[in-house]
From Swiss-Prot:
Glycosylation sites (chain numbering): N31, N56, N85, N95, N118
Residues of the signal peptide: 1-22
A Pfam cross-reference name: LIF_OSM
Phylogenetic placement of the source organism: Eukaryota, Metazoa, Chordata, Craniata, Vertebrata
Keyword Secreted in annotation: yes
Keywords: Cytokine, Disulfide bond, Glycoprotein, Growth factor, Secreted, Signal
Organism name: Neovison vison
Function of the protein: LIF has the capacity to induce terminal differentiation in leukemic cells. Its activities include the induction of hematopoietic differentiation in normal and myeloid leukemia cells, the induction of neuronal cell differentiation, and the stimulation of acute-phase protein synthesis in hepatocytes.
Record carries keyword Signal: yes
Superkingdom of the source species: Eukaryota
Cellular-component GO terms for this entry: extracellular space
PANTHER family membership: LEUKEMIA INHIBITORY FACTOR
Name of this protein: Leukemia inhibitory factor
GO biological process, one term: regulation of cell differentiation
């Protein structure tokens, strides 16, 4: 499902991710002006690189924390249960122009943010005592929100991009316990894989 994103998207995504819903955001008009809520920082690309380096550096630890918390059969069947087999994940082309890479990064962050919201919601029910996992998921989502805001600032101020089509992953609310755990593991495996490529591209 696709929606249009504009300057108000960071705030809407904060609300969207907080509740972990899998439903799309309201549609923003195509002719929306390119405006950000706050002035952009002068060292924006450095901030984007630092945020990418941070999430890249913590992605593997989050992945391990996740599959360990799920218990058997996950830790001993990572290739089968946690392989990054997510077919609708937004693509990224590391050799594209900066504008193209930023647009693709925006789509990836929006997808990941909604996915982390779903994973966090599920884990609070399935593994209520896995507090370190909950904390790590929240910290990652917080960094991604800041990254999304910075990417939007850069797109708006330098390239006058007023909207970006974004898509969200599957909502897990109707799935059984095992499928919720498996999909979360696959998404975090994909996240770990993709964020490493993205971080090197900037």
């Amino acid at each position: 499902m696709k929606v249009l994103a504009a300057g108000v998207v960071p705030l809407l995504l904060v609300l969207h991710w907080k509740h972990g819903a899998g439903t799309p955001l309201p549609i923003t008009p195509v002719n929306a002006t390119c405006a950000t809520r706050h002035p952009c920082h002068s060292n924006l690309m450095n901030q984007i690189r630092n945020q990418l380096a941070h999430v890249n550096g913590s992605a593997n630890a989050l992945f391990i924390l996740y599959y360990t918390a799920q218990g058997e059969p996950f830790p001993n069947n990572l290739d089968k249960l946690c392989g990054p087999n997510v077919t609708d994940f937004p693509p990224f082309h590391r050799n594209g122009t900066e504008k193209t890479r930023l647009v693709e990064l925006y789509r990836i962050i929006a997808y990941l943010g909604a996915s982390l919201g779903n994973i966090t919601r599920d884990q609070k029910v399935l593994n209520p005592n896995a507090l370190s996992l909950h904390s790590k998921l929240k910290a990652t989502a917080d960094i991604l929100r800041g990254l999304l805001s910075n990417v939007l600032c850069r797109l708006c101020n330098k390239y006058h991009v007023a909207h970006v089509d974004v898509a969200y992953g599957p909502d897990t609310s109707g799935k059984d316990v095992f499928q919720k755990k498996k999909l979360g593991c696959q998404l975090l495996g994909k996240y770990k894989q993709v964020i490493a490529v993205v971080a090197q591209a900037f």
